[in-house]
Amino acid sequence: MISIAVLGYGTVGSGVVEVLEKNKDVINQRAGDEISVKYVLDLRDFPGDPIQEKIVHDIDVIINDPEVQIVVEVMGGVEPAYTFVKRCLEAGKSVATSNKALVAKHGATLLSIAREREINFLFEASVGGGIPIIRALNSSLTADRIEEITGILNGTTNYMLTKMFYEGAQYDEVLKEAHDNGFAERNPEADVEGYDACRKIAILSSLISGHQVDFEDIYTEGITQITKEDMMYAKEMKMTIKLLASSKRDGDHLHAIVAPALLGNEHPLYSVNGVFNAVFVNGNMLGDAMFYGSGAGKLPTASAVVADVVDEAKHLHRNIMTMWKNEKLELLPIEDTEKRFFVRISGDEKMRREETEAAFGAVTFVRAEGLENEFGIITEVMTEGAYRKIAEKFEGILHMIRVEE
């Protein structure tokens, strides 16, 4: 029997216990041994819940018990999660986590400790919930040089943008609806400002480069400035707007960005709607591939965590190699990235056509039915730096959204 401990009995922690119980026969068969929860660490007690007999309040109980071979960390946040996970690894216990904040900040360090002790630190659920993207990068796609990873990595914002697109609603309306339906946190800042997606693409960027990519270095925009009017233009152009997290290779370096983008209806991420997530991968041998599924939620996330537990049970005292060194990779400046830009401009198109073309060069003019005293343009491909220089001097820009090719 393999004894495990679960750190945190919130949404995901209780989901892990539920998955292990409901699917115990198939899980034990695939692990090659019986997996049993011995302890659950939480500050709270749960009277009336069968889990109460396994509740402990002191991490040392888990660390000092040689029977515990695998620890599941689903507490969230960087501390005390980092201290607890580090101590567990140093005590020779493998760890599986869904904690993106922990992995983005300390993933390389924790992987190094696991390597030294011939144990494992796995984190499939930290990026795409139930989407097996990390396992794919570490196994199925190891023969490829990954040229691009672009994903819809946040279910809350994708739900909101989908509602805005199909129902013509404004941002504040769909945020309230997301709250009411349980898709948004009480404080939605991490989701709507793009911070959640940023940490996830930082993890993926670190994995494809083999070096530490700091999430603080990734240019990040959220969806708070997206309006009903933006969606009207998108429909006119047979496009949609998604919050994309993207990492693209340029030689030995990477460009990384999190920002809303306009997608044409031929783009593989165009039809990913609601709370679903998807990751588009391009490899130099594979070509294009898509991974799609539930990016969050109790059971999809717990399922991914338990899959890591099974992997660790099959590899006790044998490290599963993950290339992610502590050496930091400097990202290429966003000013050097090349895109087309959709720009909304105030005023009459006929009156401003000449000055617009003089400033931006050859552009495509766009009108949205029902909108007056404004028009839109799509520029030719230019660098972000070139666009910013033009925009600084050009009066009447209402909003800009990058176009994803």
Q: What does each model-identified segment do?
A:
Residues 175-271, 276-278:
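Substrate-binding/catalytic subdomain of NAD(P)-dependent oxidoreductase enzymes
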Residues 268-323, 330-336:
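ATP-dependent carboxylate/acyl-activation modules
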Residues 81-87, 91, 100-138:
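Rossmann-fold NAD(P)-binding glycine/threonine-rich loop
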Residues 260-284, 298, 359-371, 379-381:
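Low-complexity, glycine/alanine/valine/leucine- and proline-rich hydrophobic stretches
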Residues 309-405:
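A conserved regulatory-domain signal marking ACT and ACT-like small-molecule sensing domains
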Residues 1-90:
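N-terminal glycine-/serine-/threonine-rich beta1-alpha1-beta2 phosphate-ribose binding loop
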Residues 94-96:
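A short hydrophobic/small-residue beta-strand
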Residues 68, 115-196, 203:
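Rossmann-like NAD(P)H-binding beta-loop-alpha module
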